[in-house]
Amino acid sequence: MSSYLEERIEWYDHNYRMGTPLINDDQFDKLEANLFRVNPNANYFSKKSILPLPSLPKDRIEEFIEGLLPDTRLIIEPKIDGCAIALQYIDGELVKAISRKGGDLTNKIKKIPDVPNKIKVQGLIQIRGELYAPAEHDRTSYSQRQAAAFMRAADSKSDHLSFCAFQIINGRLNQHDSLQYLRKLGFTIPEYRSLNFTTQFEMYRKQWSNKKLFNNYPTDGIVVKLNSRKLQLIREKFNESYPHWAMAIKY
């Protein structure tokens, strides 16, 4: 029974990522939940539990928006200078936290005030975010060093660090809705801007460069993302090495 259900889910998931969804999100989530109840150790969950933390590409904005319609909605977020962390929850319980290099930080991350140990979600959900030192927003290298020191030390204080969640890994919502859903679950999300036209990007880039945008964070750039999950999946299909629907700007 579980193997047949697992095959169905993998088939639906494959078609979704190819841009041809066969069922809606609610139906898919129910199938995942049923599989988890029947067989929580299914290979499907093992494959999904590989928490990817790829570095963002640093291409030219012209290349990023090439081929997009002028009214394609974009999201601008701060590129927080800290350490990337991926969280995994099963039936609302935080079960795993890893660093970009794959280190298991679960027990340490549970000490961070901004990371809820329990959330109201059934089944599997994986979340990406940044661990950083917010009080040092004018000293970016210090923020990253503080986060890295916390991860390395056997026993270190966590009260000076924060966690900002900005992505549901392998999620099905657009970026704006993903951020709002993360907020609803109790996570701190980054300040962000929605662009209704691709030509608005330069205005926000200049604001950040002139220290008039995202000043509440230790930033070393800004991140531009496609809002549409459908467009994100199209770009993922042609480039699996990193999420080409998100790009870091560091100038």
What are these model-derived regions, one by one?
Residues 1-251:
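RNA/tRNA-interacting regions in translation and RNA-turnover enzymes
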